[in-house]
Structures are given as structure tokens and as C-alpha cells.
UniProtKB/Swiss-Prot annotation:
It comes from the Bacteria. Keywords: Ribonucleoprotein, Ribosomal protein. It comes from Leuconostoc citreum (strain KM20). InterPro entries: Ribosomal_bL28/bL31-like_sf (IPR034704), Ribosomal_bL31 (IPR002150), Ribosomal_bL31_B (IPR027493), Ribosomal_bL31_sf (IPR042105). The gene is rpmE2. GO terms for molecular function: structural constituent of ribosome. GO terms for cellular component: ribonucleoprotein complex; ribosome. SUPFAM superfamilies: L28p-like (SSF143800). It holds the Pfam family Ribosomal_L31. Belongs to the bacterial ribosomal protein bL31 family. Type B subfamily. HAMAP family: Ribosomal_bL31_2. The keyword Ribosomal protein applies. This is Large ribosomal subunit protein bL31B.
Length: 88
């Protein structure tokens, strides 16, 4: 392996800008900002969305009405000779 060609892999704190929660992980990303986490200083990376604030992980996700969209489509194009599977 060649020496000094790999990026520096080190502990980094990821900060959720929405909730303020901090996550300690390892990364090659660089930052000039630092923060204290569990008594030690780490580089900090600010994130807009993390698992702490993303709707999928928080359970607050919005579901679309797929059935309503299909019914609307069928009503709109009913006169063009297409048949529903229910009519068979």
C-alpha cells in the first residue's frame, strides 16, 4: 500500500441543525469548526436532516392517497374505451 494517499479517518460529531442532537461517528470529512462532546473536542459537521429529524425515522411521514389518484385517473379517462380490472 502506498503511504499518505488515504484521507484522514477520524472521529467527527454530526450536529442535526433542526433538533440540535449530536452524533459521534468516524468520517473523512473535514471541518474547521469544533464542538465538545462527552468531555472531548471533536470537529463538527452541521447536517440539515439526520435520522433524528427525518420524517421516515420519526414516524411523522405523510402518506399520499394512492387510491384517490387512481380513481381520479379512471374517472378522467373513462370515456376513452379503457376498462377497469373490476369489470372483467
Amino acid at each position: 500500500m502506498q503511504a499518505e494517499i488515504h484521507p484522514n479517518y477520524r472521529p467527527v460529531v454530526f450536529l442535526d441543525a433542526t433538533t440540535g442532537k449530536k452524533f459521534l461517528s468516524a468520517s473523512t470529512v473535514t471541518s474547521n469548526d469544533t464542538t465538545e462532546f462527552e468531555g472531548q473536542e471533536y470537529p463538527v459537521i452541521r447536517m440539515d436532516i439526520t435520522s433524528d429529524s427525518h420524517p421516515f425515522y420519526t414516524g411523522k411521514q405523510k402518506f399520499t392517497q394512492a387510491d384517490g389518484a387512481v380513481d381520479k385517473f379512471n374517472k378522467k379517462f373513462a370515456g376513452f374505451g379503457f376498462k377497469n380490472n373490476e369489470d372483467k
